[in-house]
A protein has these predicted regions:
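Extended, composition-driven regions rather than compact fold-specific motifs
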Residues: 1-228
Length: 228
């Protein structure tokens, strides 16, 4: 299904998925993507993705692909047809954020939308959750949730590794009272900058945050945990 002009959702079915465990919305799985090398010793191209929806009883898995470049994942997803197969591994481990905070703030770009969407949908009824997502125009999504969701969509006007628009949107946002959790995922330098701003300048407790670089300019298949 084409969720937005640049976001494609593909469904996978396998009996092996009945044993698939994904305890956290930002889990990572490895996709073993084919390459142009047809030799017997050719190795697949590995890429990290988020399990968007999992149905272990039905043996199905949904993965969202951000069609943002001509990389191997985009090429495979854009040309995938019913009956095509793909090897998937993981997730190897989960960092579970408790669903007992007073509020949540989720920040990211297109690459973070699968994890953001899943978390918004899985949060308990009534809990406030604000999302700040920067993307190309026309990439807004809607999520089915019983949480008190407040979406903030920021239209990108510059480079994808520019943190200024997200920071400006956050500067106008008053963090709610009580104990809250902030989650950030974007280009590595953006995620690091926003985490520093929210902790060092806004005073949010360091231990109640999680930040990651889901990609890094100039590097293929980059993923970086950001913290002390």
């Amino acid at each position: 299904d084409r969720i937005t002009p640049h976001m494609l959702r593909l469904g996978f079915i396998s009996g092996d998925l009945q044993d698939f465990v994904s305890a956290s919305p930002d889990d990572h799985i490895k996709l073993f993507l084919p390459t142009a090398d047809a030799s017997p010793d050719a190795k697949p191209c590995l890429r990290d993705f988020t399990p968007r929806r999992v149905d272990t009883e039905g043996g199905s898995l949904a993965i969202d692909f951000a069609l943002h470049d001509a990389g191997p994942a985009t090429q495979w997803a854009a040309s995938a047809r019913l009956g095509d197969t793909l090897e998937i591994g993981g997730p190897r481990g989960s960092t579970v954020v408790p669903d007992d905070f007073d509020w949540y703030v989720l920040i990211g770009d297109e690459t973070a939308l699968p994890a953001i969407g899943r978390r918004v949908e899985e949060l308990r009824a009534g809990v406030p959750v604000a999302t700040f997502v920067i993307s190309a125009p026309g990439e807004k999504q809607t999520f089915e949730t019983t949480a008190a969701w407040s979406p903030h969509w920021i239209a990108r006007t510059g480079e994808a590794d520019d943190a200024s628009l997200l920071r400006a949107a956050l500067a106008d946002y008053v963090l709610p009272p009580g104990d809250g959790f902030i989650w950030i995922a974007a280009e590595s330098s953006v995620a690091r900058s926003l985490r520093s701003y929210l902790i060092d300048e806004r005073g949010h407790p360091r231990q109640w945050s999680k930040a990651a670089g889901y990609w890094k300019r100039g590097e293929a298949d980059a993923h970086e945990k950001i913290g002390d």
